[in-house]
Amino acid sequence: MAPSFFIPKFLYHSHIGGSVVLKKFYASSLGIEKHYTLYLPEGYDETHERYPVVFFLRGHEREWFNAREDSSRNGRTLKHVADELIASGKTGKMILVGISTASVDNSVPCLGVNMLNPHATRAEGVGTGRYEDYLTHDLIQHIDSTYRTIPSRKKRGIDGFSLGGYTAVMMGVKHPDLFCSVGSYDGTHMWYDFDDVRHDDELPDDYTWVRTDFFKVAFGEPRDIAYMKQYNPLNLLMNAPPDELEKIKSVQFHILAAAYDGNKGNIERAEHLLEFFEKKGIKNSFSDVKLTPTALHDWHHANLYAEKTLQKHWQAFSKL
């Protein structure tokens, strides 16, 4: 069962830091309405100032702002992190958007891909399944036209945790014309060619992606591996022509992971990703991929990550 969506009433009052509201709009690529959770910085309604924007992903739009998402976060959310960074002067003001890349009940991950088999589920909120089009066209255009963003790639970032971290990196590699700054905490990154180097089984053996039922709506059953490679950041990177590679290299990437693998984290996937980044001359803004020596795959550590990555996004926006 998905956690209840709890945004305390005081979060809606703009005089206590930024305001958080749940919004929806009609997404033409999906043929349905989609919700998003919006953070507007303190004073937004009192000025005509424009702001950079960062899109935050996990699955459901509530997750980065839901005080009850898991017990580890102790009521602390992305709103608290952003308010404190802005108040301390470590970042300037930004608009933050928690977006939906899943069904309404969060049972079907949509991943920011144009799904192969969206009609295989009855879950509400999937629509046509064209989630890449939804993110790159509908959502960005809606946010830029509805709120006072700075509507430029130079002032737009994307970030995520777990599957949201995978999606953020995939978007940064596949659409470097849309984002200048990309972050990921403990992303469920794909192995290159879906070849999990930790074992010597018949390919493809990236079992998380090619065998679990979780992704059959997105990528078919059996999996269409050739299609999946179009959404594998490492395959995209290794096959990128020189001009596209230069665009990707212009993106600033901020990759961190939990300190463990298996059921505690995805550090080996992050290390694999960064090995290929290094081969292509792409730098990680963090020198150590571990968030902390004991970091876990939970919302407490995702909040700690956000404290670091929001500063990285702000630095990226300030350079351009």
Predicted feature locations:
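Non-catalytic cap/lid and distal C-terminal segments of serine-dependent acyl enzymes
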Residues: 3-320
